[in-house]
UniProtKB/Swiss-Prot annotation:
UniProt entry tagged with the keyword Transmembrane helix: yes
Name of the protein described by the UniProt record: NADH-ubiquinone oxidoreductase chain 2
Keywords: Electron transport, Membrane, Mitochondrion, Mitochondrion inner membrane, NAD, Respiratory chain, Translocase, Transmembrane, Transmembrane helix, Transport, Ubiquinone
Locations listed in the record: Mitochondrion inner membrane
Protein's membrane topology: Multi-pass membrane protein
Length: 348
């Protein structure tokens, strides 16, 4: 692709998200979403493969439907209240439709089916953008409008997302699908706590982006897309394999790694607000995620026979990408748990 076109597309993606993040006017928020969506389509289709085309079409149809629902919600609210302000979503019907729209954009259950399919059909770099950067705009709108949204519906979808995110990843062998289901589960955790402590949602989002970015960087570095290719990584880059499996454990919320911090704080916040049943359901559902990560680790480390490197691997004779950012990201993705008391003090 032409470097000028790549620069224009990247600038439009960043500009669209920035407009959403900085706007309090519903029409400008909608325009930002549309700019971002139209610019991300060529990024998803850059491999010129039929699967990429199919994934891009699914993404386009889903996001277009969500944008239509958002515009419908804004119009209903405008008719009843005369307000364009994002913080004033007073009409119950508009509030319900807006909740559905944002859930569809984030990939919350039961609107989650597009996330694994789209992630599986696109290249790793596009998957990284889809599962990290593309979550910023809808979550920022959810953060702003959360006091006016249908919280019963949002909590129900959050619980379903945590359950389906763990359940859907159980029998997967494709790493992109595993990370997609992990994204669904993490979105469930973030939206569950947003009505009690919105700042905790931002902390969870930050750690999720850190861990997901680190894993995708390792997958891009080694060109690994399946669980079998991780097993072959032992012969080429054993240290990188250990790092990736450790970060997967962190993503699953295993103490004493960084990923345990947001789950600990969210469960503590839910119990503090007398939502013990909700905290129990989410904690039990998180075990599903941890199970398929541990199964992946077990299959990679303990079920492979010791072997010499007699297999010509895809990355063996290619120039490897530089990894100058990887040590910092790895440390932040695994060793932030001791900062939990300070985070609790800042967020309370």
């Amino acid at each position: 692709m032409n470097p000028i076109i790549i620069s224009m597309i990247g600038f439009t993606i960043i500009l669209g998200t920035t407009i959403v993040l900085m706007s309090s006017h519903w029409f400008m928020i909608w325009i930002g979403f549309e700019m971002n969506m139209l610019a991300i389509i060529p990024v998803l289709m850059k491999s010129h493969h039929p699967r990429s085309t199919e994934a891009s079409t699914k993404y386009f149809l889903t996001q277009t439907t969500a944008s239509m629902l958002m515009l419908l919600s804004v119009m209903i609210n405008l008719i009843y209240t005369g307000q364009w302000t994002a913080m004033k979503l007073a009409n119950p019907t508009a509030s319900t439709i807006m909740t559905l729209s944002l859930a569809m954009k984030l990939g919350l259950s039961p609107f989650h089916f597009w996330v694994p399919e789209v992630t599986q059909g696109i290249p790793l770099t596009s998957g990284l953008i889809l599962l990290t950067w593309q979550k910023l705009a809808p979550l920022s709108v959810l953060y702003i409008a959360s006091p006016n949204l249908n919280m019963t519906m949002l909590l129900t979808m959050s619980i379903l997302s945590v359950v389906m995110g763990g359940w859907g990843g159980l029998n997967q062998t494709q790493l992109r699908k595993i990370l997609a289901f992990s994204s669904i589960a993490h979105m469930g955790w973030m939206t569950a706590i947003i009505m009690f402590n919105p700042t905790l949602t931002l902390l969870n989002l930050l750690l999720y982006i850190l861990m997901t970015t680190t894993i995708f960087m390792i997958l891009i570095f080694t060109k690994s897309t399946t669980t079998l290719s991780i097993s072959y990584m032992w012969n080429k880059t054993p240290i990188m394999t250990v790092i990736m499996l450790t970060i997967l454990m962190s993503l699953g919320g295993l103490p004493p790694l960084s990923g345990f911090m947001p789950k600990w704080m969210i469960i503590q916040e839910l119990t503090k607000n007398n939502n013990i049943a909700l905290a129990l359901i989410m904690a039990m559902s998180a075990l599903l995620n941890l199970y398929f990560y541990m199964r992946l680790m077990y299959a990679t480390t303990l079920t492979m026979f010791p072997s010499s490197n007699n297999i010509k691997m895809k990355w063996y004779y290619t120039n490897n990408l530089p990894t100058k950012y990887l040590p910092t990201l790895t440390i932040m993705s695994t060793l932030l748990l001791p900062l939990t008391p300070m985070m609790m003090m800042l967020l309370n």
